[in-house]
Amino acid sequence: MNEKNVYNAIADVYERFSDSAPQIEVEIRTVFGLAGEIQGKSVLDLACGYGLFSRLYKSRGASKVVGADISTNMIEIARNKSRQYGDGIEFHVRDVCNMESLGKFDIINASWLFCNAISLEELEMMFRTVANNLAPSGKLIAYTIEPDYQLTKGNCSNYLCDILSEEHCRGGLLFKAEFTFPSRNPPLPPAPFTMYSWSREQHAEASHKAGLQIEWHKPMLSQSDIDNQPAGFWDTYQNNCHEAAFVCKFL
């Protein structure tokens, strides 16, 4: 598994995870709750994958949407869908750590980008790329692993994400995990991936070096989410959540 491109090998099944995982709706609600008004805005979707958020921004009225991802397989899927829907979204294969400016965007979306920084240097590089592509009054909406999450306090198996191990690595934490598909018929084998967790202080320092200030937010779990699942289903998500969001603007 390529350390920097873990999703290339599982691109064909990742959409099935997104279609099945109950917390995806929470993620979508959180991202757009923080994004605010979309109509007429330009959007850059970093770590866009197969284009889920790119298309959601476009359907909510964004005037221009550009997606970028390191995975050639993900971008191929995204482009095929864009041709199918005729939505005019641009998709590019890019390593965000070494990406040129594609313009100045009102909103930069980064769902599950920063947890792919394999070092503090890469974390800083990602924030610099954001700063180089963000309009002066724009904002970054990011979704990533919760810095306070601890495997010893509960796994995420209810949410189709089985975390196998947690270890110290390069000043942060490395989580080895699998997407699972227990309800698929015929069943699919687990899809392995990794995440790197950096502290709030490390995020703050890296973003500040790029001229950005950071504000953390919890996922917007609703009462209807709770009511639609068996009792206790969301307990780990509420008490030891593995997900978090943050917003960045220029200082």
Pin down the residues of each PLM region:
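A short glycine-rich, Lys/Arg-flanked "PGG" loop and its adjoining helix->strand segment in the class I
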Residues: E124-P136
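SAM-dependent methyltransferase
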Residues: I141-A206
